[in-house]
Amino acid sequence: MGLATTTSSMSQDYHHHQGIFSFSNGFHRSSSTTHQEEVDESAVVSGAQIPVYETAGMLSEMFAYPGGGGGGSGGEILDQSTKQLLEQQNRHNNNNNSTLHMLLPNHHQGFAFTDENTMQPQQQQHFTWPSSSSDHHQNRDMIGTVHVEGGKGLSLSLSSSLAAAKAEEYRSIYCAAVDGTSSSSNASAHHHQFNQFKNLLLENSSSQHHHHQVVGHFGSSSSSPMAASSSIGGIYTLRNSKYTKPAQELLEEFCSVGRGHFKKNKLSRNNSNPNTTGGGGGGGSSSSAGTANDSPPLSPADRIEHQRRKVKLLSMLEEVDRRYNHYCEQMQMVVNSFDQVMGYGAAVPYTTLAQKAMSRHFRCLKDAVAVQLKRSCELLGDKEAAGAASSGLTKGETPRLRLLEQSLRQQRAFHHMGMMEQEAWRPQRGLPERSVNILRAWLFEHFLNPYPSDADKHLLARQTGLSRNQVSNWFINARVRLWKPMVEEMYQQEAKEREEAEEENENQQQQRRQQQTNNNDTKPNNNENNFTVITAQTPTTMTSTHHENDSSFLSSVAAASHGGSDAFTVATCQQDVSDFHVDGDGVNVIRFGTKQTGDVSLTLGLRHSGNIPDKNTSFSVRDFGDF
């Protein structure tokens, strides 16, 4: 009674899980040889739906049988399973247009021990494979092999995990190719590839043939099928799990696993529906442009709402930065602890990709918040906060201020990247150094307009941990003590440069004026010289006899000598004179003087030969009487 109940439950369980593990056990082979040969020809069932095989029900019932079961019980089990296989074959006899066939062409020939000394051909292996496209869609991950040994035991075995994984991979490629291609040429090419895979699986099964032969009772070979079924079941579970795709995406993000495959899939998905994507994108861009350009003026209530939204977005942006900095600090702590144990630089291969991935996540989040913030600022008309910096010179802006602002921005960027060493901390009165650094950085970043708005003050108060009044007071003092002197110094320096330039221009103009005046002065001097020369040449036609015979001349000389004047000089220019020549041509000086005797003396400006006793020889007028 117990045996019949067990047989019935086993047959029902086997009927429920038909299709993938189609086998007949090996109890009393002699009573079912003809039926077994027919079962070998119907191993592949065309169009049959392949359910997931669960080994718990069948194997547990198999383990309930004793190791040396009698012939009657074994024969009943064999007849029952053979009958079910024949019914299955008759039911699918009409659907014989399958493109797949058994992986083992010589499946009728096998070797199993029927007794200790005799070898005879026995059924060794059956392999079932889904054939129709509908079955591919429904059950793609069902594959397995069954080995039936003659003699004293029965062995249920699946292919190895590696072979099963390869089979699953090739089968998924084949199914995807068949689903995606409709032409007969592509289908034939993939079918050829699948035939190559069958040969590979055949070689693998033939190389591992001796591992599946069992001699003895059933219990001795039960551990291998259980291990194989559990491994292949784990693979099926992982492949069909709903967490597989998210896990693959995470691996792609962190370790760049399958990056190209995922990119191709995303591109194919985007290109599969180009009209919808393009239309939606175009419509969105046009609508956003229209709202940006034609946005009506905001009401006071809307403006207040956008102000609140702007403050919230700024706080969110600050929170993202704070979380990212906290993540970097925690990661650095882990890296330091790992380096202390494993050596310096040992954590770099493990943390680089993770840091890049997390930085990408934080950047995406920050960009999303920044886009919303920019939109709110544009609606409020705050172009500086929106990132639309005005081009050209504004009020109070000079090229020097612009250069200073650029240098300060570069210095701040270097500080953020860690390229510049941080200043050593030192105790300081007043506000905390960290808060002062944040406020000073904001001041130099907005050097052209160092007047924070209410939202900026609120954000700076959150960043520095100060109150809003402290932030306002600090900016008032900073504008008076720091910003204003710098601006005044810049303007003074520019004014000084302008004055120097003006002085240089004035000096150049003065030099030009002096040169012009010198040129003008040289021209009248030349005219006067010409005039004097002309007037001096008029009395040169006089002769010596005229001077001697003129009584008025002599009287004038005498009167001059008695008048008290000691001497006077008369210059005459004798040029082209033919009657009077004294020592050649040239200018001769005649000096009239008075001696102690009262006689008029005359001195000629002649060079003496050296033997003249007196240098200033005077002659009387009487001496010239005969001349």
From Swiss-Prot:
Binding region for DNA: 424-486
Biased composition range(s): Low complexity: 215-225, 507-530
Give the start-end ranges of region BELL domain: 302-373
The answer to whether keyword Cell membrane applies is: no
What GO MF annotations does this protein's record show? DNA binding; DNA-binding transcription factor activity
The keyword Cytoplasm is assigned to this record: no
SR/KY domain, as annotated region: 241-257
Q: Which Pfam families match?
A: Homeobox_KN, POX
Q: What does this protein do?
A: Transcription factor that establishes leaf shape by repressing growth in specific subdomains of the leaf. Negatively regulates knox homeobox gene KNAT1/BP expression.
Q: Give the multimer and partner information.
A: May form heterodimeric complexes with TALE/KNOX proteins. Interacts with OFP1, OFP2 and OFP5. Interacts with KNATM, isoform KNATM-B.
Q: Which family does it belong to?
A: Belongs to the TALE/BELL homeobox family.
Q: What is the name of the protein in this document?
A: BEL1-like homeodomain protein 4
Gene from which this protein is expressed = BLH4
